[in-house]
Amino acid sequence: MDVSVGTDAAFAPSAAKSRRELNNISEVRHFFRTNDVPIYFFGATPFNLLGLDRWVRNFSYITYYDAWDGAHPRVFTPSHKPYQEFESGEEINNWLLTNPEVRAYIDGSTPRGIRPKIAMVFFDAETENICRELGYDLILPPASLREHLDSKIVTTQLGNEAGAPSVPNVLTKVEDWAGLSAAAEKAGLGDELVVQTPYGDSGKTTFFISSEADWRKHSADIVGQEIKVMRRINNRPVAVEAVLTRCGTIVGPFMSELIGYKKLTPSQGGWCGNEMYPEVLTYENRRTATQLVRRLGDRLANEGYRGFFEVDVLVDT
């Protein structure tokens, strides 16, 4: 059986480097189709940027797992992988970066005098050090800035400053059920609450609390840190991805989010997929949401950030 994989960007002709204004999607596509510098995406799988090699010439995936069993011409997976339990995506990527097979693959496919560019979703300060030592360009914001902005508390504060507010909430610290109830009552949040801690996957750091029994169940994960306490709404979850460039914020299409489906995730508040269709938002809601995302992007730019970010748009039905 033949496997058809779109790799048309790999066969596009080279072009001289130049910085010029790109005015539409066609020009953006041409710009990336003539890219001469190898770009490698690192990850457990190629899921996050699947299909980008159709747009970007010299774009390859270096992954721990190979879903194509060697059939995809632009996916590289080391053949020798001793059993190892990873605690995070960062650990997987750092392991791949230091793997001899991976380093040999990059060296063999990168022209002399060219510094390969590295992209990934999960990285940390160790990743930066490894890339620096190997002579790779990690084309991402500094890990310290990303960690700072990854806090749900910080992004809530920045959103408020930018005029892109969240669901009614209060940022606070609580030590017991009485403290949580008092903070929620003072903020007018009602009796059904959603509590988030600053860092971590939404499914593991989002807690639905409407009784003291709920509090006892989750308190060990909440006490001792600043939290975001929100009014629980009848939410239709929507997500949008945007890119902050030197020319401003480009907002992508709005997608519905799949949250908490038991067959797909063990977590009540856990993300488990997206769907995209025209009626995700009404025209007015889409226009308003686009403006709010751009405001947040402008505020992130003031922090020195540039690159991709994702925003959850909560629609109270």
What are these regions (language model features)?
Residues 122, 173, 199, 231-233, ...:
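Short, flexible loop/turn elements at secondary-structure junctions
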Residues 50-51, 128-129, 139-141, 202-205, ...:
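Short helix/loop capping segments that flank catalytic or ligand/cofactor-binding pockets
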Residues 234, 242-300, 317:
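ATP-dependent carboxylate/phosphate-activation module, predominantly the ATP-grasp catalytic core
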Residues 1-148, 177-179:
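ATP-binding N-terminal substructure of ATP-dependent carboxylate-amine bond-forming enzymes
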Residues 241, 304-316:
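A short glycine-rich, hydrophobically flanked beta-strand micro-motif that places a catalytic Asp/Glu
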Residues 165-167, 188-194, 208-239, 295-302:
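Conserved ATP-binding module of the ATP-grasp superfamily
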Residues 132-205:
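A conserved helix-loop-beta module that forms one wall/lid of the active-site cleft
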Residues 168-169, 192-216, 237-239, 261-281:
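Glycine-rich phosphate-binding loop of ATP-grasp-fold ATP-dependent ligases
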